[in-house]
A protein has these predicted regions:
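Active-site-adjacent beta->alpha loops and helix N-cap segments on the catalytic face
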Residues: 44-60, 73-79, 98-114, 132-137, ...
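Surface-exposed cleft-lining segments at the edges of enzyme active sites
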Residues: 93-107, 120-124, 157-162
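Glycine-enriched alpha-helix->loop->beta-strand junction motifs that scaffold or abut catalytic
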Residues: 36, 58-62, 86-91, 119-121, ...
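Structured C-terminal cap/extension of enzyme domains
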Residues: 4, 12-16, 22-30, 55-59, ...
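Hydrophobic faces of well-ordered beta-strands that scaffold small-molecule active sites
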Residues: 1, 39-42, 63-69, 92-94, ...
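Active-site beta->alpha loop and helix N-cap motifs at the rims of alpha/beta catalytic domains
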Residues: 10-105
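Histidine/lysine/aspartate-rich catalytic loop segments that bind and position anionic ligands
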Residues: 136-165
Length: 241
């Protein structure tokens, strides 16, 4: 939501962008800290978001930053990796659209070079992808430290193939996560706002591996206390309440 990617409508995108000023982004991170969240994930390309991350980390923010890396605004992926590392990411993963393309072309050399470059900088490196097959291919190469697995094979907005949400995809994503013998970040577990949050959290934590986590976007324009409410739901689920 910080970058205006609602995965719903263009009007919704614009609403999110207008709402999330730098002050509101900072407030959301501060509320996440107080609620017990320890990590945030953002992209590396939206100027307002990148600037907010820089300022937050510069002023001692306690959340760890995992960067989703793309290179549409850089000359190559190595330059994008270096910038995120210099800003202060603790880990990074490559945008699913880039990994999907490497999988289609079975381009092991390129994705291995990206992973090696990031790891040489001292950060954990992972991959996202929109189809389980791409994740299983990368996993077979044993080159990533973790996987960011989308619950829906919805495609990438950046190539005009996004917004495809089918419930049948969820089972395949979960099966993929359970086959991958490395930590996974499950994302789009609510289908970009299409699934009730409580049901989505319960379903996700009931099926992912014990060391896995979830990544959810939070648009406080819909509900100001969304951060605290989400944390409370997850605590209840994990405690068996």
């Amino acid at each position: 939501p910080f970058a205006g990617f609602s995965h719903q409508t263009r009007q919704r995108d614009e609403e999110m962008l207008a709402y999330y000023t730098e002050d509101r982004i900072f407030e959301t991170w501060e509320r996440a800290e107080r609620a017990g969240i320890n990590t945030m994930i953002t992209n590396n390309e939206t100027p307002s978001v990148v600037q907010a991350v820089k300022e937050y980390l510069r002023t001692g923010g306690s959340l760890q930053w995992i960067a989703q890396i793309a290179c549409r605004k850089k000359s190559n992926m190595f330059e994008a990796i270096d910038e995120a590392v210099n800003i202060g990411c603790c880990a990074l993963y490559f945008h699913g659209g880039y990994v999907d393309e490497r999988y289609r072309n079975k381009d092991e050399e390129t994705i291995r070079a990206w992973c090696d470059h990031a790891r040489s900088a001292g950060v954990a490196v992972g991959v996202a992808a929109h189809a389980p097959e791409a994740h299983l291919w990368v996993h077979s190469l044993d080159i990533a430290d973790f996987h960011a697995v989308c619950f829906f094979n919805c495609g990438s907005l950046h190539n005009g193939k996004g917004h495809k949400f089918k419930l049948r995809d969820m089972g395949r994503a979960i099966e993929c996560i359970r086959q991958i013998r490395k930590p996974c970040i499950a994302y789009k577990i609510m289908g970009a706002g299409r699934i009730d949050p409580g049901m989505a959290f319960e379903h996700a934590f009931g099926h992912i591996k014990p060391a896995d986590v979830v990544n959810v976007g939070m648009y406080r324009g819909d509900k100001d206390d969304m951060v605290e409410e989400n944390v409370a739901m997850v605590r209840d689920i994990l405690s068996g309440s």
